[in-house]
Amino acid sequence: MARKLRVQYPGAVYHVMNRGDRREPIYADDQDRLLFLDTLAEACEKTDWQVHAWCLMNNHFHLVSETPRGNLVPGMQWLLGVYTNRFNHRHKEFGHLFSGRYKALHVEGSGHGYLKAVCDYVHLNPVRAGLVASGQPLESYRWSSYPLYLEGVPQRPRWLRVDRLLGEWGIPRDSPAGREEFAGRMEARRRAEGSGEYEPRGWCLGSEEFRQELLAQVSEMATPKDGGEEVRQSALAKAQRIAQEELDALGWAAPDLQGRRKSDPQKVRIAARLRRETTMTLEWIADRLCMGAVTHVASLLQRHSRKGPSSEETLF
């Protein structure tokens, strides 16, 4: 089974999530929650992570983490492994605690509102789960970073960074007035919950430019053993680029493909290049180049590989 590729680079921001094995609790009591936070603090000390938001639920957690050193993978391996060992030791258990590999969505953190969307989602998670009654303030749920945003600096852990989120809310200073304004805006956001624009789906949250930059990194890093939506999208983007490059060189537009024979030598040559340089299926290649049935394309490519491309067919 293909492993999911983890794209790491200095300054990357991720929304990290993981659930208990078989959706069972990963915290038996508040002592376990404190144990997890202590382990997270150690992980941040080792990795220099900066955490923008976190929330501990019964059988899963959310973490919005920035990695100045581009080291999400070793940090998460340490965090999950050490917490599992400590949990098992405390409860005299053994075996897996978490369900498979954690999910990590890339988040564009350059001030376009994406970091705010993710952190708001994390801080409002207890509301969606029914853990905060309608008459209670949001900070009454103590197992998230939100109450710490409303505290002064001495009460916060060093690894919690609040300035970025406050800035995206348009709050320039981490002051009593700024924190009061933040609380008011979050309560208003809570009342509007249900119309939010962010859901933790896919593999990244950001602008199209940000997505394309990530896909370029994936294209450079990916190996045949890698899997995941970002790898599939990177492969698709590469194949589309090659196909368009070939059409431009021939002076063809996409409709020209439909008007040419399915076995046109140039189509076969382009198909061979796509087959050689990408991981796209014969189905995709046949559809993109208007070459008909997959079996027909496979036969054409076999003949092409046996005789080799002629000088008239070779453009590059």
Task: Please state what every model-predicted region is.
Residues 62-64:
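N-terminal functional module of multi-domain proteins
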